[in-house]
Amino acid sequence: AVVVVVAAELPEAAEAAEPGEPVEGPEAAVEVAEPALVPVAEPEAEPVPVVAVEQPVAVEAAPAAVVAEADVSVPQPPAEPAEQPVPEAEAEVVAEVVSEPESVVPEQAPEQAPAPEPEPGAMPEPGPVSEPEEIPAPARSAPAPGYDDAEREAVLRVMRERRDIRNGFRGDPIPHEVLLRVLEAAHTAPSVGHSQPWDFVVIRSAETRSTMHELAQRQRDAYAKTLPKGRAKQFKELKIEAILETPVNIVVTADPTRGGRHTLGRHTQPQMAPYSSALAVENLWLAARAEGLGVGWVSFFDEREMVRALGLPEHLEVVAYLCVGYVDEFPEEPELTQAGWSKRRPLSWVVHEETYGRRALPGEEPHDLLQETVANIRPLDAKALGEAWERQKRMTKPAGALGMLEIISAQLSGLSRVCPPPIPEPAAVAVFAGDHGVHAQGVTAWPQEVTGQMVANFLGGGAVCNAFAHQVGAEVCVIDVGVASELPATPGLLPRKVRPGTADFTTGPAMTREETLAAIDVGIETARDLVAAGNRALLTGEMGIANTTVSSALISVFTGVDPGEITGRGTGINDEMHARKVDVVRRALELHAPDPADPVGVLAAVGGLEHAAMVGLILGGASLRTPVVLDGVSAGAAALAARAIAPESLAACIAGHRSAEPGHVAALNKLGLRPLVDLDLRLGEGTGALLALPLVQSAARAMHEVATFDSAGVTEK
Ligand SMILES: Cc1cc2nc3c(=O)[nH]c(=O)nc-3n(C[C@H](O)[C@H](O)[C@H](O)COP(=O)(O)O)c2cc1C
């Protein structure tokens, strides 16, 4: 068994330890200059056989130092931490990480670092560094002028300062001429074929507003019932409409028949009619902002119910229900961001050059997602880490009495750069599903179709991971990164198939390097989506018949342990099949001779699509300073690959559980991670990580809620 020692960025000399406190070994103080997590062998614990054959640290890609003889040790904070914490790390995380490109890049450095993302609410940075290519054309005259600086700034300002408002409305009436200006602005919107498909129904009647309020309330309740507990708690606090508090409500409709059957541009895309009306809404919203009027868009309606309640013609589509009124103030940030419900996605995530995936802001060279992500992975923040240890000492409990949970809460502080750290809630388990060509070798008793069938089960809510997620209040997010069969579109399924299953790695590489990188990107993008959607913890999950064979191969490559020692019985196989499975792994390793220094190459040769995606999730989570709770053997294999790509990604990892698969023990030892739960589980799907989630949340909550000796008036020892 091993224990994780959390070490910081730029640590300095350790403070003198107090009596009874765990003491950091001297080696750690010397060696922790770079690594985020330093695995430390725990000598008095049960010896684990694979430790004996572990590769010497010197040949590892990771800079982490293994301190073989140390006691169970917990590092002390550096005397004067070098890095400042970010006080509101939560709201800023997404935007902020983009501006820190100077971290470790293991392969080659990107040709050009991405430009920093403008702070939300700030003016955009000056224009592109290189001039856009000119289209050769006879120069006749100067192009039509844009606005002067002040006018342009006014236009940009109104866009920046437009807010969706639900709180702080005033009852002041809206003068007719003001409302008229706002409606005129809406009416100048662009529209498909100039069909101008909108109508505006201006509602002032208290009775109608009360009817609409009741309809919205019913939908709110119905929506709340669908939420995982972690989300439902947050949602309860949110205000989602101000129908009764605003003097004017405006219904914006779209007439899909307006302009007749030959409306230009609507021929193949009927949705252009409601899109046009949505543009009218944006115009209205901006004009209202310029008048000092707040607007709140309410979409908690059943459309047909609404059409009937308002007596609208049946052929109309309702595009928007808007609450309009004067307000006390316009918040700088979206109300959902302020409430911690969501985060702003940086512009650099969504601008592609020429083809999708070549991300680049104008004037930048396109950069690849993996390089950008790795560049943003930072060590734990020394100051927050130091504060966490200090706080643990002052909490009303004997020093060290929370054992491993103290280490977790310090890690969470260092990761988030704040102490106490945010409670990792809401959380989402990302279940990546993929099939494996090596299934053909008879390494499992289960038919391959079960992968797709289990995906349907996850989406239907009937699997063990659903039950555990329900219990702990987490969201289940299912990603098809490589299931062999075609899966029907289903709510909750992210269709991200890179290829329909890997090839049989006993006869050739499992996949190409490009496919491997694409699967890693799927994981990174999943991490980005889940974190931007407000999740504060990511859990790894996976489904893929035959994937323990793949995990064994990966673990063998990264740990150097013989396949015979780490290849387990997966879903339960007999001796004969087990012997074949070991032989299959052995043959694959002989065929490919994968080089652990080239982790992407290892994944391509003997990996799985879900393993590569989990690598991406770990790297993505680490780059967004969000904890990643690892599940079992496949997550362990992925974490080894992630560490080989970016050693500091381990700073975000928490081992949820120890699987019954022998390979998992080898992986955890190599990673230096101590599992929180040890129940002989061998299911996957994220089940072990889900069981561990409340422990991780408890570690953070204790930091928030446990009194200190001073505050509680308790005498110290
Ligand atoms: C199509 C659409 C529907 C929306 N529906 C709701 C809603 O029902 N309730 C709500 O509180 N906000 C709603 N909003 C507002 C968004 O939550 C808001 O635009 C987003 O959080 C960003 O904040 P900002 O508009 O202040 O920048 C809606 C916005 C749009 C564009």
How does the language model describe each region?
Residues 369-717:
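N-terminal loops that bind phosphate or other acidic moieties
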Residues 182-187, 250, 258-309, 460-476, ...:
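Small-aliphatic-rich amphipathic alpha-helix that forms the alpha element of a beta-alpha
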Residues 131-172:
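N-terminal targeting/leader regions
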Residues 1-146:
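Long, low-complexity intrinsically disordered regions
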Residues 321-377:
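C-terminal helix-cap and adjacent tail motif
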Residues 220-228, 240, 311-338, 512, ...:
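A glycine-rich helix N-cap at a beta->alpha junction
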Residues 196-277:
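Glycine/small-residue-rich phosphate/adenosyl-binding loop
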Residues 43, 93, 101-103, 118, ...:
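N-terminal amphipathic, basic-rich helices that act as targeting or association modules
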